[in-house]
Structure formats: structure tokens, C-alpha cells
């Protein structure tokens, strides 16, 4: 999924959650209750709304009593279940105010909780009575005495209590400041460690992708939080219509099945599957676009079939043990860029039922020789004379960067050669780093200036109607384009010649979502980065 916002808005239906939730209802009865409450209130009495309906109350205690009796939401149980103290409680209240989740969702949450972000310290409602509630009373209930010790008046006792609370608040703020400072030191240490470490360990059964921490992987997921990349992907007709045709033309694969959509984005594949007759569809995505996806699902009245879960597939807890079908649009530039296939294979190993299927199921990567002397000169020879100055040293920075662009088919000078065949049902994560010898049959005498790579996608297993699409330069262009590896020193080739070479593909050791590609060709070796 070469797509890369924040979709979290303070409206009903945008919930940072692990499930797609039905929208709360504002019934006429609730409005009537609110009117009755307003009529009975003294003028100027401060009110606060219920967390789950429109009723108003004049104290936190009344509000929580109502939540417990009418909505089966017990704040005492919630605080103890998650070990919430002052700041955790504040975040919880603001999270509910901002995201409007259902009671069922709130009662189903387990750690990690979705209200940990600093943004939930900001009050949603001005003068919210619930934020003035002392959550520590839930841990240490105290009885209010009817007489005051040592001859203190009631006012004096209140003042002393306020001083005690102020001191406790200052202590908590100081502790939070120290915690933030420690956290920053830890982050800096982790960044320094990553930048100075060349090797990540990886076994054949696990992926370094699964081990990435939030601060390491945040840029990747945040890039998918903006609508723009999803618009680009949805408008890619080759991509989107291929998935649609595969699903709609093979409904037997989805009828009454439980389907998992890994990296669901806006939910388009989940909705295709639901329309094809799936019994249940689970969409998982870590990016903020999931909040818009929740609204999209409700707008299309598919919330009874589709459940959306926010988080990494390696970390979330699905509401089912096994699924029948896994679908995902995981492909990146040169197929493997972004390493999202690692996550799909993780999901397959953990959740796919025996006899289940993963789609797309077959993928191939191919190379082809390119001759485009003008473009090579524009990007490489350009540095030999820049306004009369020599800048040839810049070539060392330009050449190692793979270029993603749409090639003119007329620049192709060889037949393609496959270098990798992936069957998603049998491939392991370790197979995604590989070396391959290749031979390119030259079709036209010319100068070879670059080698280009692209991939083809197949929906085949159990399909009555097979669907295939290509990202090659001779096919309709897609948002994946082609990946071009410019040669430092072009060389001549003759028609009919067999140009032999070797390619090695690895994850970047410092950024495993990026790729390192090494080409050996014409007695020369060059390493390229795709990032």
C-alpha cells in the first residue's frame, strides 16, 4: 500500500478504538428529561451533561450514579480496572467527551487504552464538573464528619483541605515533569542507539516490523493519516478496480465468511467484501484515517457487518480466533517497499483458519533494461558542468537513490526477467530478503543507462474469475509507477545479447520499511536505496 490527517475530530462517530461502533442515539425521551431538569434547576446552577446521553446534572456524583444505573457504566470499576490516577482519569473523561464511544465499547477496553495521548489532557467542555471530581476518593473513600477537630470551624477545615489538595496537585505536576524528562531521555537514547547500530536481529519466523516502537514507526503511519494518499490510491483504477472485480466476480470466496482486511485505510476493500456477502469483516489500521473510515462505514449502513479496529495487526486483539479470508492492499514501490507484507504474513500465521485464503495470493517482481541517454544526462552528467563549475562529486549522492517514475515504453531495450515469485500462502517473512541471478535478452542495439523494476499481482486461488494486473511500463500506469536504478557508467549492448546480472534485496538495517537493492551488472556493483 503505497499510500501514506489527522482524522480524529471531536464529533460523534470518530472513535480511537479497537472496534467500529454504532452511533449513539439522542432519543426524544432524553430531550424531555433534559427539559424537566432545566425547569427544576435554580437560576445559574452549574450543570454538566452525562457522558452517554443529553441529560444534565449538577454534580459529578449525580452524573456517575446516572451513568451506572441507566447506562451500565461504572466509573469506579473503570478507574480500578485500568489503575487510573489523576491524569489518567482526566484523559478518560475528555476521551469520552471528544470521541463519543458507546458504553459497550468502553466496557470492552483492555490495555493499552486509547486515551493515553497528551491531547486528552485538554478539556473538551468548559468548566466540566466531571474534571473537578477527585478520582482518588474512589481509592480512599472518606466519611464527612459532623464536628470539626480542635475547635476548627467548617470554613477553616475547607481551607486546610484545599491547601492539601493544592500541595498534592503541585506534587503530581512535578512528578509528571520528571516523567516527561525521563521519557525524553529514553527516546533520545533509543534514537542514538538506532542511528549507531547497523544490525537488527531477525529470525525466520518474526519480523523487525513487528518489533518497531511507536516513535520508530510513527512517520510511516502518520503519512497514511492524510486523505491525499488515499485519494490517489482510490483514483488508481487499475489498483482499485482489480480488487473490486476479484471480490465481486468471486462472491463464493466471501459468502458467509469472516474476512480480515489488513491496513484497511478508508475501508474500501472491507466494503467490497461486505457487499459480496461476507458474514463479518474486520478492518485493522494504525493510521488516523481509520476515524474517517468509521464514518464511511456508517454512511453506507455497513456497521452491522464491518468492525474497524485501530492499531497494528501485530498488537491488536481481534474479537475472533480465526478468519476465513485475509485481504490487503499492501504493495509498495518495487513491491516490497514499506514491508507491509510482513504484517500480512504475521496475520496469516496467527489468524488464518485452516483452508483459508490470502489475497492477492501471487506476486512477481521483474527487471528490464532501459536506454534513455537524455534522461541519464539530465540527472547524472548534469553535475559535470553546472554554470561553469564542476560538481561531479554530487553524483555519489544522486546515483544511489532509486527513482520512482513512469517510463516511456519506447526506452525499453530488453525482454523482462522475473527475479522473485511470491505465493502469500507459503512464503515466510525471511523469504522477502533475497538474491537472484537474472538474464536480460537485449532487443535493440543501444546504450544501457538503467535497470527498471516493477511487479505483477494475481488473484488466483479458488477463483472462478481470475484477475491480474501489472505495474510494468507497457501497461496502464498506476500510482506505483516503476522503480529505476540509474547506472553510473552506461554501456553499449547489442540486439540478441544476453545481459547477465545479479540483484540482492534487503530491508534497510536502520529503517526496515525501506529497501536496499544491490545490482551487479557488466562487472560493476552498485547499491541503491529506496526510501
UniProtKB/Swiss-Prot annotation:
Site positions (Not phosphorylated): 87
Active site: residue positions: 329, 338
Effect of residue 87 to E: Markedly reduced affinity for RPS2
Claim: Glycoprotein is one of the keywords in the record: no
Impact noted for substituting residue 87 to F: No effect on interaction with RPS2
UniProt GO cellular component terms: cytoplasm; cytosol; nucleus
Disordered as annotated region, ranges: 1-43
Phenotypic consequence of residue 468 to A: Loss of interaction with ALDH1A1
Span list, region Mediates interaction with ALDH1A1: 186-531
PTM annotation (N-acetylcysteine): residues: 2
Xref: Pfam families: ANM3_C2H2_Zf (PF21137), ANM3_zf-C2H2 (PF21336), PrmA (PF06325), PRMT_C (PF22528)
E.C. no: 2.1.1.319
GO function terms (MF aspect): histone H4R3 methyltransferase activity; histone methyltransferase activity; methyltransferase activity; protein-arginine N-methyltransferase activity; protein-arginine omega-N asymmetric methyltransferase activity; protein-arginine omega-N monomethyltransferase activity; zinc ion binding
Activity regulation, short description: Inhibited by N-ethylmaleimide and high concentrations of zinc chloride. Allosterically inhibited by SGC707. Allosterically inhibited by (1-(benzo[d][1,2,3]thiadiazol- 6-yl)-3-(2-cyclohexenylethyl)urea) and derivatives thereof.
Zinc finger extent (C2H2-type): 48-71
Keywords: Acetylation, Cytoplasm, Metal-binding, Methyltransferase, Nucleus, Phosphoprotein, S-adenosyl-L-methionine, Transferase, Zinc, Zinc-finger
Function: Protein-arginine N-methyltransferase that catalyzes both the monomethylation and asymmetric dimethylation of the guanidino nitrogens of arginine residues in target proteins, and therefore falls into the group of type I methyltransferases. Catalyzes the asymmetric arginine dimethylation at multiple sites in the Arg/Gly-rich region of small ribosomal subunit protein uS5/RPS2. Also appears to methylate other ribosomal proteins. May regulate retinoic acid synthesis and signaling by inhibiting ALDH1A1 retinal dehydrogenase activity.
Record family assignment: Belongs to the class I-like SAM-binding methyltransferase superfamily. Protein arginine N-methyltransferase family.
Protein name: Protein arginine N-methyltransferase 3
Organism: Homo sapiens
Gene this chain is encoded by: PRMT3
